Design a protein with these regions (language model features):
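Acidic/His-rich, metal-assisted hydrolase cores and their charged scaffolds
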Residues: 1-234
């Protein structure tokens, strides 16, 4: 990507993915490009990561967004949020033409360095289409291997369970098929059925004196309002 790009390179990633920031910084240095962290979350996460020693770079390699926009376009990389097509992110605003600091133009190369999270396909591909309509070349996982999963493999999950030896396990953040497989892995490494709580969102889990019990499920989720009593919309 860096070899082929003739103009600006805009890399969209998660603001919390420090390892990807490091990769971009190192690659940009090899290609004699300066890097700018765009947006508050990206800037703050990079600052904190550097202070804690998780992100390593020379101060001279990083420039402000204002400096980057005034430099030759083949000498800069802009790190932005919005790899999941979020409409209020920097990349989302670039796609919609609503970003007030700079826009997308012919010659820009935009890299979406993460695969769409299940359920996010529509906003991601909508953003890609709109960026291309504005003249950018968009690189994403379907056409080039720019994505590496940030999720642990099954063997890594087993290793973590061996190291931590948790008293209880509550698989979260995934579809039921994923949570159930997580439970199977825990059983394989020696955990007991009663140590694992496989629950749906809204289920109360209580811990009293170190013991886990399951309570009732609180109704939740989306609430749709039809607006019938709100009045006409002009």
């Amino acid at each position: 990507v860096f070899y082929q790009a003739k103009g600006r390179i805009i890399v969209a990633t998660f603001a919390s993915l420090i390892s990807r920031m490091q990769q971009v910084l190192e690659t940009a240095k090899r290609h004699e490009r300066k890097v700018s962290f765009v947006g508050l979350s990206m800037t703050e996460n990079a600052r904190i990561a550097k202070e804690l020693g998780y992100l390593n770079y020379d101060e001279s390699q990083v420039v402000s967004t204002e400096q980057a926009l005034s430099m030759p376009e083949n000498k800069v990389v802009l790190l932005v949020t919005g790899s999941q097509g979020e409409p209020t992110s920097i990349l989302g605003r670039l796609a919609n033409g609503t970003n007030n600091r700079f826009g997308v133009k012919e010659g820009d190369t935009i890299v979406l360095s993460s695969h769409p999270i299940p359920g996010n396909e529509e906003p991601v591909y909508r953003a890609i289409n709109r960026l291309m309509e504005r003249g950018a070349d968009v690189v994403y996982e379907a056409i080039m291997p720019v994505h590496v999963s940030g999720h642990a493999s099954q063997e890594e999950i087993k290793l973590l369970l061996h190291l931590v030896k948790p008293r209880y396990l509550i698989p979260i953040h995934g579809e039921m098929r994923m949570l159930r497989q997580h439970k199977r892995l825990a059983l394989e490494v020696g955990m007991e059925e009663e140590q694992i709580a496989l629950v749906q969102n809204g289920r109360i889990i209580e811990f009293t004196h170190g013991e886990m019990t399951l309570g009732e499920r609180i109704p939740g989720g989306y609430v749709f309002v039809d607006g019938i009593g709100v009045g006409d919309v002009d």
